[in-house]
A protein has these predicted regions:
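Cleavable N-terminal signal peptides of Sec/SRP-targeted secreted and luminal proteins
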Residues: 3-22
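Long, solvent-exposed N-terminal ectodomains/accessory regions
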Residues: 18-242
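Serine/threonine-enriched low-complexity regions used as flexible
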Residues: 103-105, 110-149, 154, 247, ...
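Low-complexity, intrinsically disordered segments enriched in Ser/Thr together with acidic residues
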Residues: 117, 207, 211, 234-239, ...
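Edge strands and adjacent loops of beta-rich recognition modules
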Residues: 306-351
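Short, hydrophobic/aromatic-enriched beta-strand segments in well-ordered soluble domains
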Residues: 318-322, 338-339, 368, 423-433
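Short beta-strand elements of extracellular/lumenal beta-sandwich folds
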Residues: 343-371
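A surface/secretory-pathway sequence property marking extracellular, secreted
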Residues: 375-419, 423-432, 469-471
Length: 556
C-alpha cells in the first residue's frame, strides 16, 4: 500500500469519525472590491459543536471551550483591530470592531458575582491570545443597557443586561504574537486550508486588519429544541490597491502565496467574490468561477462568483484582471454614517463631538453609547444636541457617572434621526491631573479614548454585508430579506492631551548629577589612591651639551 493511499484512508477515517461525533467545520473567504481603489477580504472559520459532544473536543479548540465552560459564558465577542474602517466610503463590514482590543460577554443567569467572573475571563483570554486584557478592571468596564444585545439562542431574561460586561483598550497594538495563538485554535492551524493565506508579513501591511473570536449558542433545529455552540474566528483585511500599484489582484499579490487546497477536516471550503461592480468597472476573474449567485436583499442586488475549494493539495490562485483603467466610479453612501472629533483648546476644558448623518429618506432610530474613562469626566448637564440643551430627538437616555480611579463615565441615548439630516452631539469634559505613576509610556503622545458604539435597525440592506442572526455561513445572506437589518457600528477613536509634567526634568537632573560626580571622581580617586613623591630636579642641560652626550653614547 502506497503512502498516498494510506494518507487518504486515514483522512477519510478521521472525517467519518468527526461526522459521527456531530462537529462540523466550515471555512469561507469573501472578497469585495471597494471604490475607488481598495479591496476587502473577509475570512471566517466556523466550528459548530454538537451539544452531545461539547464535553469532548474533536474540531473545537479545547483551550477556548475550557474558558467558556469554566467561567459560565453564554456569549463572547473578542476583537483586536489596527486601523480605522471608513463607513462612508466602504459601507458596513461583516463584523465591525473598535480600534485596539474590545471584549464583551454575557454570563449565564447562574453567575451571581459577574464582576469576579469578568476579571477571571479577561485574565484567561489575555494568556490565551497574548494580549493585554489583564489590564481590564472595574475602572474601564461598563454594562451597556441599550446598545448591545445578544445574538445567541439565550433563554428569555428580563435582566439580561445585568449579565453583560464590556471593555475596550484603544491603545492595544495588534502584532504577530496575537495572530499565532489565534491560528492554533483552528483544526488545521496554519498548515492547510484558508488559514495558510494568513501571512503575518502581508496582514500587518494592510490599511485595516482585524482578528476576532465570537462564541455563541445557536438553534440546531427550527423549534430550537437542540442548541449548538458556534465558534467563529474572523479576519478582516482592507488592501490599498494604490500601494500594490495595480488594480489587478491575485492571491499571490495579496497574501504572498497561493491557496494550498482546502482543510481536510472542513465540511465546506468556499470563496465568494463580489462581482456587482463588474457592471461599471469590468474585470475578469481567473480562473472562471464554478457558478454565479444572484441575491436580492432589502432593496440591494448583489452578484457573487462562487469557488468550491477541494482538499486535493493542489495550489489554487484566484485573481482579477481589469479591462478599462480609467472607468468612471461612483460610490453610494450607506444609510447611516458618522464622524467623531475633539473640541477645545488649552489644558482646562474640552468636548467630544459625534456627528450622525442619516442619508435615508425615512427617520431611523439609533442608540449612541459614549464610554469616557475616569480621567476624562463628562457631565450630563453639558450635553447639547444640535447646539440645544433639550431636544425632541432623544427618546430615552441612561447616564452612569464615573468615579475617580474606580469606574468610567457611561452615557447612552436612544434617538430618532430625521430623514436626510445631520445630528450633532456635543458633551464637554474637563482635564484632570494624574499621579505621576499613572501616566503611560510616551505620555506626551496623548491619551486614547475608546470608540462610541452606534446601534441601529437599518430599513435597507444597502452597503450591508452582515449575516442574519440565525445564519452561520455566508450563504445565509442570499435572498435574506428582513423587515430590518441590525447593525452595531463603532466610530473612529479619539486622542486627547492631558496636562503632562515635564518628565525630562528628572532625566536632566540625573544626567547633570552623574556628570558632576564623574568629573569629580577622577581627581579624588587619584589623590586618595596614589602616593605623591617629589621628583628630584638637576641643573639644566643646554642643547650643545645634549648633542655632545649623544655622540659620546654612540662612540661607547
Amino acid at each position: 500500500m502506497g503512502r498516498s493511499t494510506f494518507i487518504l484512508r486515514v483522512t477519510i477515517f478521521l472525517i467519518s469519525l468527526i461526522c459521527v461525533q456531530g462537529d462540523t467545520f466550515h471555512e469561507e473567504l469573501v472578497i469585495k472590491p471597494f471604490l475607488p481603489a481598495h479591496l476587502y477580504t473577509y475570512f471566517q472559520f466556523i466550528t459548530l459543536v454538537n451539544s452531545e459532544s461539547s464535553e469532548d473536543t474533536h474540531l473545537s479548540p479545547r483551550s477556548l471551550l475550557e474558558i467558556v465552560s469554566r467561567f459560565q459564558v453564554d456569549e463572547l465577542h473578542f476583537t483586536l483591530t489596527e486601523g480605522q474602517w471608513r463607513h462612508r466610503q466602504w459601507g458596513y463590514p461583516v463584523f465591525d470592531a473598535a480600534p485596539g482590543a474590545e471584549l464583551y460577554a454575557w454570563f449565564t443567569s447562574e453567575v451571581k458575582d459577574v464582576d469576579s467572573q469578568w476579571k477571571k475571563l479577561s485574565a484567561a483570554l489575555s494568556g490565551l491570545f497574548c494580549a493585554s486584557l489583564n489590564f481590564i478592571e472595574n475602572f474601564n468596564t461598563i454594562t451597556p443597557q441599550m446598545a448591545l444585545w445578544p445574538m445567541s439562542a439565550l433563554p428569555t431574561n428580563k435582566n439580561i443586561t445585568s449579565q453583560l460586561r464590556y471593555a475596550s483598550l484603544p491603545r492595544e497594538i495588534v502584532c504577530t504574537e496575537n495572530l499565532t495563538p489565534w491560528k492554533k485554535l483552528l483544526p488545521c492551524e496554519s498548515s492547510q486550508g484558508f488559514s495558510a493565506l494568513l501571512n503575518s508579513r502581508m496582514i500587518h501591511n494592510t490599511n485595516y486588519h482585524s482578528i476576532g473570536v465570537h462564541v455563541r449558542k445557536i438553534c440546531a433545529s427550527k423549534d430550537c429544541s437542540e442548541i449548538n455552540l458556534e465558534i467563529k474566528q474572523t479576519v478582516s483585511l482592507v488592501y490599498d490597491l494604490n500601494i500594490i500599484k495595480s488594480m489587478d489582484w491575485s492571491f499571490t499579490k495579496l497574501f504572498g502565496q497561493g491557496l494550498p487546497g482546502a482543510c481536510p477536516l472542513a465540511t465546506s471550503s468556499k470563496v465568494y467574490v463580489d462581482v456587482t461592480s463588474n457592471a461599471t468597472r469590468p474585470f475578469q476573474l481567473v480562473p472562471p468561477p464554478e457558478s454565479v449567485i444572484y441575491s436580492q436583499r432589502g432593496g440591494s442586488d448583489t452578484t457573487f462568483a462562487l469557488y468550491n475549494i477541494k482538499a486535493d493539495g493542489q495550489m489554487v490562485t484566484i485573481g482579477a484582471k481589469h479591462g478599462s483603467k480609467n472607468a468612471l466610479t461612483l460610490s453610494t453612501p450607506p444609510p447611516i454614517y458618522f464622524n467623531r472629533y475633539i473640541l477645545g483648546y488649552g489644558k482646562e476644558f474640552g468636548g467630544i463631538v459625534t456627528e450622525l448623518i442619516n442619508n435615508f429618506w425615512t427617520p431611523i432610530e439609533v442608540v449612541v453609547l459614549e464610554n469616557a474613562p475616569w480621567w476624562l469626566p463628562i457631565q450630563l448637564s453639558s450635553l447639547r444636541i444640535n447646539g440645544e440643551a433639550k431636544s425632541d430627538l432623544v427618546l430615552s437616555r441612561y447616564y452612569s457617572p464615573g468615579r475617580s480611579r474606580q469606574k468610567p463615565y457611561h452615557l447612552e441615548l436612544l434617538m430618532k434621526l430625521p430623514p436626510r439630516s445631520t445630528t450633532t452631539l456635543t458633551i464637554d469634559f474637563e482635564f484632570i491631573f494624574l499621579k505621576w505613576q499613572e501616566y503611560p509610556p510616551d505620555a506626551n503622545h496623548g491619551f486614547y479614548v475608546g470608540s462610541a458604539i452606534i446601534t441601529a435597525n437599518l430599513p435597507t440592506a444597502r452597503n450591508y454585508t452582515s449575516l442574519p442572526i440565525s445564519g452561520s455561513t455566508f450563504d445565509s445572506i442570499i435572498n435574506a430579506s428582513k423587515p430590518w437589518y441590525p447593525a452595531v457600528l463603532r466610530t473612529n477613536g479619539a486622542m486627547v492631551s492631558l496636562p503632562t509634567p515635564d518628565f525630562s526634568m528628572p532625566y536632566n537632573v540625573i544626567c547633570l548629577a552623574c556628570t558632576v560626580v564623574a568629573l569629580a571622581f577622577g581627581p579624588l580617586h587619584n589623590i586618595c589612591t596614589k602616593e605623591l613623591v617629589l621628583k628630584p630636579t638637576g641643573t639644566p642641560v643646554s642643547l650643545t651639551q645634549k648633542i655632545m652626550n649623544l655622540f659620546k653614547k654612540k662612540q661607547d
